[in-house]
């Protein structure tokens, strides 16, 4: 069997709600239609722990995050998921107990950071996730240290997306919150199409809001919302800003 078939078997086993360890995978597949799940000639005994172990090592060497993203994009293409708009965000997960970080050089650091769970008393890990606007399909997933800052995470992701987005003929947009828009990150995002919220820490933000309130030249949007568009250059990037009124 191939590495891909071994990984597929582990996923199917995990979805079987049997809570069986991996070394019992052959037992899990004993009464399953192997030819339908895989192909003719594949037998349950092929998924022994030696093959599964070698497959996990191969995935690790290739890069788990990279492999996940590549498979997710292929799946989206097959199902005709619209990938023009890609929403990027992070979540924090609070943890308890002791963790031995010395056991794995590649392990993330479980430590204190900005808690989105509102539990600053607990250590945490951070998960970065980018999903398609169409259906919310995850296409990027990466774990980070518990004290990783969104500004840094967004910068690195934007940098990695430049070439990927340019390979595609039609425009693709990175959608993220205000942590994407910093002077440091502007050197990267100027190479992308992006949609973000302008941070309130910028002095220009309240000035422009007051300006459009004075002008009152609103355009109707929907459900009681109105907007005014402002064309300007900022951080060396020609941009279109919208002020939304509700």
Predicted regions and their residues:
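Anion-binding and metal-coordination hotspots
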Residues: 1-246
């Amino acid at each position: 069997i191939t590495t891909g078939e071994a990984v597929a078997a582990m996923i199917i086993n995990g979805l079987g709600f049997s809570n069986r360890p991996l070394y019992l995978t052959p037992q899990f597949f004993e009464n399953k239609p192997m030819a339908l799940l895989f192909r003719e000639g594949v037998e349950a005994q092929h998924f022994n722990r030696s093959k599964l172990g070698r497959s996990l090592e191969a995935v690790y060497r290739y890069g788990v995050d990279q492999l996940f993203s590549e498979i997710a994009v292929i799946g989206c293409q097959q199902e005709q998921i619209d990938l023009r708009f890609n929403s990027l965000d992070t979540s924090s997960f609070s943890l308890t107990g002791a963790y031995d970080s010395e056991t794995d050089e590649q392990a993330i650091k479980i430590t204190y950071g900005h808690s989105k769970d509102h539990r600053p008393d607990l250590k945490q890990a951070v998960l970065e996730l980018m999903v398609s606007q169409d259906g919310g399909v995850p296409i990027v997933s990466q774990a980070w240290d518990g004290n990783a800052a969104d500004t840094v995470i967004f910068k690195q992701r934007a940098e990695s997306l430049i070439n990927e987005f340019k390979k595609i003929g039609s425009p693709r947009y990175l959608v993220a919150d205000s942590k994407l828009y910093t002077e440091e990150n502007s050197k990267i995002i100027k190479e992308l199409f992006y949609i973000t919220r302008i941070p309130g820490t910028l002095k220009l933000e309240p000035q422009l809001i007051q300006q459009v309130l004075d002008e009152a030249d609103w355009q109707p949007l929907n459900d009681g919302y109105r907007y005014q568009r402002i064309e300007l250059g900022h951080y060396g990037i020609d941009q279109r800003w919208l002020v939304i009124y509700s």
